[in-house]
C-alpha cells in the first residue's frame, strides 16, 4: 500500500471519529421522539412510511445536498464553520449595505452554537444510558447518576488532551456505523416493503393528509440531521475528500439503513416505540449495545467540546470575546487546544441540563432550535458566496438558496413552537452569548476610537526628542492596537521618566480574515528613523499569537532582539463612562467586567513577565 493510500485510510478513519459522532448517534432518539415525544404520532404503517420518507429526504437535502455538495465548497482557505464562513462573507461584502447585518447573523450563529454544544453531550449520553431501561426498568433511577459520572470524567480529562484516547475514536465509530447498518438490514429483511418509503410521495401524502401532525413531526425529524453542520465545521482538519468519501461510503448508508430498520421494527411491533433502537437486536445484545452507544456518544460529545474550544479561539482572534487562557495539548497539532473557561462553563451547563431535564425525551424539545437556527443562517451566508464568489446567475442563487431556506424555515418554525417545553434554553443561551459577543466587540471599537483620538502623530514625538531627552540602553517594545500614531504608554513613559530607549518598536498584533497566515507573511517591519520601528505581526483567526516567536522572526529582516535587554510596555486601561456613552450603562459595566477578568496580555501573548512594564491609562467610552 502506498504512503498516500495509508494516509487517506487514516484520514477516513479519523474523520469518522471526529466529524460524524453527533449525527451518527441521532438514531438513538430521532424516531423515538417523532412517535413518542411531546407531540406523539400514532404508530401506524401509514405514519411510519410518511415519517421515514421525511427522514430520508431531509437527510439527503439538508446534509448531502446542502452541506456535502454545496456549503463545503465555501471554504475559507480550507477552513469551515460559522465563524470561518462569517469571515469569508464579511470580506466579500465590504462596501455593501448588507455587510453589518450579515456580520450580526454570523455572530448569532456563533451564539446559537454554544447552546447546541451544551445540549449535545447531555442528550447523547442520556439516550445511550437509557438503553439500560430496556434490560430492566429497575435501572431507571441510575440513568442520571451514570450519565453525570460519564460526562464528569469526559470534562475532567480535557486539560490533559485527548490525543491518545482520540486514536480510538475512529475505530470505535467505524464499529458503531457497522452495527447501525447490520441492525438495520436484519430488521428490513423482516419487512422489506418498508424500503418503499424512499418514494417522496409518501412524505407528500403524509403532509397533505395530516398537515398539523406532519408539522409537529418536522420538529423531531430534524433530530436526524443534528450534527450535519459538523461536516463543514471540521473540514479544516481533514479536507473535503475524506469527509465526503466517509459520508457516501459508510455514514449515509448506515444511518438510512438503521432508520428504515427501526421503521420495519415498528411496523411489526408498534410497542417497541418506547426505545426502538435498543429493541432492534436480541436481548443479549442490549448491554453490549449500551456500552458501544455510550462510547459513541462520548465521542460525539468530545467532538462538540473540541469544537467549542476552537470557536472560542476564533471568537477571541476575531475580536468577539476577551482574551482567555488557551493551552495547547499537543506539540504536533496546532488545532488541539484546551480553553479552561469554556470547558468549565460547558460542564456546569451540561450538568444542569442532565439533572434538570432528567431524560433525553425532555431534552429533545430543546435541541432543535439551535441547530435549525444555525442551519438557516448558514444558508443565508452561503447565498452571498454563491453570488459574489462563485458568480452564479442571480436566478440560480435564488432558486437554490431560496429552496434550502424554505426547508430550513419549516424546520425552524416547527421547533420554535417548543419553546415552553425546553426550547427556551438554547434561546436563553443564544441571547446571553450574543449580548456578550456584541458588547465586547462594541466596547473594543469604542476603546480603539478613543485611543486614536488621544494618539499623538509620530512626527510630533520625533521632533520632541531633543538632546535633553535621555536615551536608555536596550529596546522598548510598545504593544498597541493602533497602526499609526504613538501609543499612550509611550507618551506616559516620556512624560514621567523623560527618557526613551535607544530602540523603540511600536508593535501591533493583527488578526486577518484568513484562518492561517504563513510564517513568511507574518512580519511587516518598517523603519521610521531615529531608532523607531513599526512592527505589524499578522495571525489568522485559527492561530494563537506568540510574541517572542514573532520577534525571533525579525532577525532576517535586520532587527535582532536580546530578551535580557528588551522591555515590553503595555497599557493597563481603566474605563469611565463619557457624557455621551457609546453603549447603555449596563453594557459598559459588562464590558468593564469582562476586561478585568480577561487573561493578562503577558500570558496570552507569551511575553516574559519579568520584562514587562504596565502603565495605567484612563479612557472615557
From Swiss-Prot:
Catalytic reactions of this protein: K(+)(in) + H(+)(in) = K(+)(out) + H(+)(out)
A GO MF label: symporter activity
Keywords of this entry: Cell inner membrane, Cell membrane, Ion transport, Membrane, Potassium, Potassium transport, Symport, Transmembrane, Transmembrane helix, Transport
Top-rank taxon: Bacteria
Main location per the UniProt record: membrane
Pfam families, per the entry: K_trans, K_trans_C
Its membrane topology: Multi-pass membrane protein
InterPro entries: K+_transporter, K_trans_C, K_trans_N, Kup
GO cellular component terms, semicolon-separated: plasma membrane
Localization terms from the record: Cell inner membrane
Chain coiled-coil ranges: none
Family as reported in the entry's similarity comment: Belongs to the HAK/KUP transporter (TC 2.A.72) family.
Record's function text: Transport of potassium into the cell. Likely operates as a K(+):H(+) symporter.
Protein name (Swiss-Prot/TrEMBL): Probable potassium transport system protein Kup 1
Organism: Rhodopseudomonas palustris (strain BisA53)
